[in-house]
């Protein structure tokens, strides 16, 4: 149902202390949710018709607030936005406690399934026992326009964003995070709940401290289950989806698979199964080949790799349970796990935008040159706003101050990568072309057609491969001087089958490395999943109910 209580709350806390919130109901801002229902109190049959047919979502799971949510809570700035709802910083008018309020517009609950999802989310959050690792629900209520879930405020940001900022964790830190995630899974399973949407974005840190508690959020896709019960509905996020979900025959074991995917990402910075298309991702999951050859895996302990393998066991009957994961040698000896920052390798991939990324940047420039004016209009406007002295480049300082103006549109991870791209630019600034290339990389604007066109640009002889000479030629055009060394580094990183040249698949993999897979992991609709499932059945990748 979308993330709650995202990190801008930390800044908001100071604003609250300086009287952003009204002291009384009458002084508050307009009630945003009442206005959304389209049947306001202004008159005519429209309003009356809505009242007669008013949708009651929560039933016994919640309470009515006839005067609107702001009778009890003062709403402030927006903290996050999901498919169905918006999360606001809010304050309890009586206790003055700062909380998060996820408001789900009733207009977006178009089907009985949507309504049931919200009702079940509340029921599950009430059903699960209090835990330091699960965000607590304070109140669930509804008014004419929306359902409101008031919960504790988490100010430390997403696990997702910390992974991006660091590149990846040390083994010791990854073990601590994995333990928390699997303890949440164990608690859910013991109480008859499958989470069904475990991913880094659905874990928030309570505060900004390094040792902050990690909390699970968003039970919007969770479901109650009984021992032996199987489900067929395809839900979740593609990169974290277990193979039996795609086969439409699954149980609680899927949460262990998703936790295994998160562990893999914590250790190396990218997911184990990914491809250019949704169907490609699904087929990679069904194949189940896990890459432990690429850096930094040679430096990861055998115990860590063993746990990843057992959590990503394709057969759910053989996959570890939550209890078995917690008893695994690697987690049992977590305090002895290597504390060496493995992240230097992956973080440097994200940070540099040089060496391998010099080639990638060249490819992005090729793509940018062929984009329509409409496709780059927003990026061009952003560049103009940030280039305050109109000198045609965005300096480090201009970028930092400009980010604040666009803060609501850029995730922390994107901000971090933009700044780091400038740091390693050489001149400490971005011209428009470089800014456009970085933005393309961050916003995942390069689709299959764009990538194919860029590949053909480099594959001068049309033999289906980018060979060292062609790579050399491309880098000469881009002004590189240490060409032979750069070509060697690029091939070392991109040429995964070590045949001395870059195939289209390897080129696409290079272009996808970075933030794009994270963008793609956000909520996918049931309709798209059903279409994907049909395609997989038609091409023979999946046989229904086949484990």
From Swiss-Prot:
Record: residues binding Ca(2+) 3: 459, 461, 463, 465, 470
MF terms (GO), sorted A to Z: ATP binding; calcium ion binding; calcium-dependent protein serine/threonine kinase activity; calcium/calmodulin-dependent protein kinase activity; calmodulin binding; protein serine kinase activity
Pfam families in the record: EF-hand_7, Pkinase
Covalent lipid sites (N-myristoyl glycine): 2
Main location: membrane
Sites where the protein binds Ca(2+) 2: 423, 425, 434
Span of domain EF-hand: 374-409, 410-445, 446-481, 482-517
Annotated Ca(2+) 1 binding sites: 387, 389, 391, 398
Membrane topology listed for this record: Lipid-anchor
Coiled coil recorded as keyword: no
Catalytic activity: L-seryl-[protein] + ATP = O-phospho-L-seryl-[protein] + ADP + H(+); L-threonyl-[protein] + ATP = O-phospho-L-threonyl-[protein] + ADP + H(+)
Positions with a binding annotation for Ca(2+) 4: 495, 497, 499, 501, 506
Keyword Membrane: yes
Positions of the Protein kinase domain: 73-331
UniProt-annotated stretches for the region Autoinhibitory domain: 337-367
Region span, Disordered: 1-53
Bias type Gly residues, positions: 37-49
UniProt remark on domains: There are 3 contiguous domains conserved in the CDPK subfamily: a kinase domain, an autoinhibitory (junction) domain and a calmodulin-like domain. The autoinhibitory domain (337-367) inactivates kinase activity under calcium-free conditions.
Family: Belongs to the protein kinase superfamily. Ser/Thr protein kinase family. CDPK subfamily.
Role summary: May play a role in signal transduction pathways that involve calcium as a second messenger.
Full protein name: Calcium-dependent protein kinase 16
The species this protein was found in: Oryza sativa subsp. japonica
């Amino acid at each position: 149902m979308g993330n709650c209580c995202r990190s801008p709350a930390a800044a908001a806390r100071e604003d609250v202390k300086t009287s952003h919130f009204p002291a009384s109901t009458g002084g508050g801002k307009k009630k945003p949710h009442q206005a959304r229902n389209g049947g306001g109190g202004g008159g005519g049959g429209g309003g009356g018709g809505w009242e007669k047919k008013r949708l009651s979502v929560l039933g016994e799971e919640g309470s009515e607030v006839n005067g609107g949510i702001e009778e009890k809570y003062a709403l402030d700035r927006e903290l996050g936005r999901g498919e169905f709802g918006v999360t606001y910083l809010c304050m309890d008018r009586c206790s003055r406690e700062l909380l998060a309020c996820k408001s789900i517009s009733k207009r977006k609950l178009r089907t009985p399934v949507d309504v049931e999802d919200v009702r079940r989310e509340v029921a599950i959050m009430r059903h699960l026992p209090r835990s330091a690792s699960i965000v607590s629900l304070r109140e669930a209520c509804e008014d004419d326009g929306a359902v409101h879930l008031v919960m504790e405020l988490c100010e430390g940001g997403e696990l997702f964003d910390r992974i991006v900022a660091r590149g990846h964790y040390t083994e010791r830190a990854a073990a601590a995070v994995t333990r928390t995630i699997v303890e949440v899974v164990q608690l859910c399973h013991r109480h008859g709940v499958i989470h069904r949407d475990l991913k880094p974005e659905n874990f928030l840190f309570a505060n900004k401290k390094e040792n902050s508690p990690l909390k699970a959020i968003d039970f919007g896709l969770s479901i109650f289950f009984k021992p032996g019960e199987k489900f067929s509905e395809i839900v979740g996020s593609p990169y974290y989806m277990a193979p039996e979900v795609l086969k439409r025959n699954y149980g609680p074991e899927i949460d262990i698979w998703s936790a295994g995917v998160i562990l893999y990402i914590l250790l190396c910075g990218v997911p184990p199964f990914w491809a250019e298309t949704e169907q490609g991702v699904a087929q990679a999951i069904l194949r189940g080949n896990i890459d432990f050859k690429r850096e930094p895996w040679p430096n990861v302990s055998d115990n860590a790799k063993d746990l990843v393998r057992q959590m990503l066991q394709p057969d759910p009957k053989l996959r570890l349970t939550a209890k078995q994961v917690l008893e695994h040698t690697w987690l049992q000896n977590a305090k002895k796990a290597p504390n060496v920052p493995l992240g230097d390798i992956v973080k440097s991939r994200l940070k540099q935008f040089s060496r391998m990324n010099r080639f990638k940047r060249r490819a992005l420039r090729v793509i940018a040159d062929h984009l329509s004016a409409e496709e780059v209009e927003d990026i061009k406007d952003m560049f103009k706003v940030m280039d305050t002295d109109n000198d045609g480049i965005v300096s480090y300082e201009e970028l930092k101050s400009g980010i604040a103006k666009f803060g609501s549109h850029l995730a922390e991870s994107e901000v971090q990568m933009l700044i780091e791209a400038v740091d390693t630019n050489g001149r400490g600034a971005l011209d428009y072309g470089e800014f456009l290339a970085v933005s393309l990389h961050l916003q995942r604007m390069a689709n299959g057609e764009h990538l194919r066109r860029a590949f053909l640009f480099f594959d001068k002889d049309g033999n289906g491969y980018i060979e060292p000479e062609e790579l050399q030629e491309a880098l000469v055009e881009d002004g590189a001087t240490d060409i032979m060394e750069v070509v060697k580094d690029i091939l070392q990183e991109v040429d995964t089958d070590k045949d001395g040249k870059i195939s289209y698949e390897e080129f696409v993999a290079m272009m996808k490395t970075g933030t794009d897979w994270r963008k793609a992991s956000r909520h996918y609709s049931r309709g798209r999943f059903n279409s994907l499932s049909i395609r997989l059945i038609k091409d023979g990748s999946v046989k229904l109910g086949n484990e």
